[in-house]
C-alpha cells in the first residue's frame, strides 16, 4: 500500500508516454525505513511481476515463482488480461531455503445476484522447508467453502472481486516419501450471529493424527433489540438570551475598555543641539 517511485523520480502510476519499456525496472519507497530492492519485471501490464530483496538477502516473489516469468496462478486479472493484483508466491532466504504459497481461483457462476460473475483468489496451501528442487516436507492446507453469509463485493479495481470464502479447517501435513500424512487439524464451527448477517465462531476442534484431541468453545452476549417510547426534547425559547453569562464575564474588563486615559504632562520638543 505504500507509494513507490520509479528510478528517475517517475511515479509508477503515470503514463510512460514514449518512454521505452524495460524488462526490469527498479522502484523505491518514498520513505526509506530500511534498505530493500524492489524490481518490476515485464514490459506491459499483462505480464508484470515483482521481486523484493531485503537487506538481509531474503527474496520475496509476487506473481512469479522464482523471478524468471509470470505465474498466472498467483495473479488476479481483468477481462483484458491486465494484472490487477499480485500475490506472494515464494519467500527464499540467502541460503536457498524457501516457502511456497499456492492459491485457488474461484469464479462465481450464479445468476440474479450481486455476486454473479465475480472472481477471487484465495490461499490454498503453504509448502515449507523447501530447498533446491525439493518443495519441502511440511504443508499447511486451508479448506474453505463458498457463499459466506457476510460476503463482500469490491469493484474499486474495475472488476468484480469477491471475498466469499469461509475458512472451515486448517491442516498440517508431513510428506513421507511423497505421501502426505496428517499431523494435526483444526476444524472451525460457526453459528449465526445477530440478525443472521455475520457468522460467529462457535468452537475450534483440534485433532492429532486424525484423533480428537481438544476443543475450545466461545460464548457471546446477545442483547435483545427493543424500542422505547418517543422522548420529548425541550429547548429554551428563542427570545431568551442564550449568552446570559456574557455581561457578567465582561464586567471585569470594563475599566480597560471604557476608562479614558489623559495625555502625559511631559511635552517633547525637537532640538538641533548647541543653539
List where the protein language model places each region.
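Conserved catalytic cores of ATP-dependent inositol ring kinases
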Residues: 1-275
Amino acid at each position: 500500500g505504500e507509494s513507490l517511485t520509479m528510478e528517475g523520480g517517475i511515479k509508477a502510476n503515470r503514463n510512460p508516454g514514449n518512454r521505452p519499456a524495460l524488462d526490469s525496472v527498479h522502484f523505491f519507497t518514498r520513505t526509506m525505513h530500511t534498505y530493500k530492492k524492489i524490481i518490476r519485471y515485464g514490459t506491459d501490464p499483462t505480464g508484470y511481476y515483482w521481486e523484493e530483496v531485503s537487506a538481509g538477502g531474503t527474496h520475496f516473489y509476487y506473481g512469479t515463482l522464482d523471478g524468471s516469468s509470470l505465474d498466472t496462478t498467483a495473479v488476479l486479472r481483468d477481462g483484458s488480461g491486465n494484472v490487477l493484483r499480485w500475490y506472494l508466491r515464494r519467500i527464499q532466504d540467502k541460503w536457498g531455503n524457501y516457502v511456497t504459497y499456492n492459491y485457488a481461483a474461484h469464479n462465481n457462476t450464479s445468476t440474479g445476484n450481486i455476486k454473479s460473475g465475480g472472481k477471487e483468489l484465495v490461499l490454498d496451501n503453504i509448502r515449507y522447508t523447501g530447498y533446491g528442487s525439493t518443495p519441502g516436507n511440511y504443508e499447511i492446507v486451508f479448506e474453505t467453502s463458498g457463499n459466506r453469509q457476510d460476503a463482500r463485493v469490491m469493484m474499486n479495481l474495475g472488476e468484480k472481486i469477491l471475498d466469499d470464502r469461509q475458512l472451515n479447517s486448517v491442516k498440517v501435513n508431513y510428506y513421507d516419501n511423497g505421501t502426505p500424512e496428517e499431523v494435526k487439524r483444526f476444524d472451525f464451527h460457526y453459528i449465526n450471529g445477530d440478525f443472521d448477517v455475520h457468522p460467529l465462531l462457535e468452537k475450534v476442534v483440534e485433532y492429532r493424527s486424525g484423533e480428537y484431541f481438544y476443543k475450545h468453545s466461545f460464548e457471546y452476549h446477545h442483547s435483545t433489540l427493543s424500542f422505547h417510547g418517543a422522548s420529548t426534547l425541550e429547548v429554551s425559547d428563542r427570545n431568551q438570551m442564550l449568552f446570559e453569562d456574557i455581561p457578567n464575564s465582561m464586567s471585569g474588563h470594563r475599566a480597560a475598555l471604557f476608562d479614558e486615559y489623559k495625555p502625559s504632562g511631559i511635552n517633547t520638543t525637537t532640538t538641533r543641539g548647541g543653539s
